[in-house]
């Protein structure tokens, strides 16, 4: 797998109320990922960038919402998120606190 591709797969963490509950209880982390990324690429990218062991990946394609920009109707772009299950006892800390 191309090393440059691994750095472009993950767009960033998806921080929401649901993702924080899942991170505390189920040992999962939620990422926004590239729309053309597959599960193998997501797993390899998380393992390489965060030095953790991934046991499973689930993906969801989210449709962009319809919005109005003044008088113009438009819509936000579609995006993809991945629920990454980490091995027992492993964690990713996005806030960097001690």
Curated annotation (Swiss-Prot):
Superkingdom: Bacteria
Designated gene of the protein: rplW
GO BP terms in the entry: translation
PROSITE patterns, A to Z: RIBOSOMAL_L23
Record's subunit section: Part of the 50S ribosomal subunit. Contacts protein L29, and trigger factor when it is bound to the ribosome.
Gene Ontology cellular component list: ribonucleoprotein complex; ribosome
Upper lineage: Bacteria, Pseudomonadati, Pseudomonadota, Gammaproteobacteria, Chromatiales
Origin species: Halorhodospira halophila (strain DSM 244 / SL1)
Listed name of the protein: Large ribosomal subunit protein uL23
A Pfam match: Ribosomal_L23
